[in-house]
Amino acid sequence: MEYDKPFKTYDEQIKILRDKYGVLINDYDFAKNVLISISYNDLIGGFKNILKKDSNSVNEITIEYLYELHLLDKSIQAFILKYSLFVENLFKNVMAYVIASSFGVDVNKYLDANNYQVYSAGTSFKENVYSEILLILIDKKREYQPTQYYVEKYNHIPPWILFKNISFGDSINLYNVLKKEQKEMVINILFNNSNTMTYDQKVEIIRNGLTNIRIFRNLAAHNLSFAEFRVKKSIQPKQLYQVLPGLIYMTEDLTQPLNIDKKACKGLYSAVLIILLLLNTNELKSLFVTDFMNAVFHGYNDEADKQKIELFTDYCKLTAMPKNLFERLHKYLKVQNNIL
């Protein structure tokens, strides 16, 4: 059998990069070390669709440029991973607070099916929530800490302990099947009682926004295609215009977001927006922007910064993020500081 993707030596991979894709390779040893550390598939597969001139050829760039673009991608992935974990913890804390205040701290009561919708937003309480959490509660291998510690030391497992062991996806599913009273309590905390959107709009933004953050977090954690990924359920930029001033650009009559913003909200920018929305202090929001800039520019002198700007411009094309991203972020911070 002639395989579609046969094994290629490093020398053969370099030849393909040079002959098929037109990548400029002046330092052969450097190119080989790049392929050893990154892999041919990650180097070309992750970037060629945006940078190519035609169906085959990338835009006459050097192997060094591809390498730097890959490092930038990984730096931004690490940044998103860091803040996705922060948002996950924040969300679980809010969920635990609302559920404990509504149903108490006895697991048999706060996980009683009568307290939840049977089915909502594609989520079944019994099949998608309870059955998953039950695996943690009945674990015999004592793998789930700190839940197992509470099983051994105390007479109950409060939700703020149990939720430390459930997955981000399970916590989102639990949110989906909350009844309106509890769901409204959650979104009022997350939106700081903002009345600029309807209840249904807030519910959808949290559901889709958190799902998108989880997806991008998983892509980064498992070394999957990150930059060019587009979500199936994008957040609606028009709904975010009031709560994230400066981050969404609208048409002159303010009836529709610009097309670039519609496209951006199907990619990585959707995760950036929701993370900023959920960070609940100006200090955290400012740190988020600072860390984002450091992920792109840190450790470089002025001359090298010009190269990083070019790299980031190409990265914005890959991700569909607005190229004036940092201008928008600083405008948002300025508005926030004036409000609070």
PLM feature segments, named:
Residues N223:
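Acidic/aromatic/glycine-rich contiguous surface patches that form carbohydrate-binding/processing clefts
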